[in-house]
């Protein structure tokens, strides 16, 4: 441990806590997530935020781009969630993200946002798949990028589970890219956009 500390590595949780950020610049203050950190699991606001993006995914929507498994044509409640996804995309224009986690609780800290984040990531992926199936590659591109950006909101969190959820959200949204690629639907310009986005992701650095 001393050897690695001499090289600059940190082993205490205080050294990896993300710095405070201005509220108006903080994605975590989005109306979709802020109620989760009132830490009142019995309140209607907490429950609504927790379940906001929860959908039951039918077996026909199971897929895995790593195994070469495509999705069937997507039919879901797009109209119901479209306005929420639009607002969420707008919230992601804020330059920072720091959830009000009780870091003083160490590795026992409650992370109520992770399930909601993953569910929202799934919705961006489903929306992009629906757009792609209709030939709307521009819309599919934007939804996919939004899903990836959502996952990257977790990049500074020092918890292993946060990084696993981050990776899961990225994987979910890589699916539409892969499907469009094997179907030769993306333009050269769109592929360049994807390449630049993928190159900006550093899972080891956080």
Name these PLM-found stretches:
Residues 1-206:
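Aromatic-rich surface patch/π-platform used for binding flat ligands and interfaces
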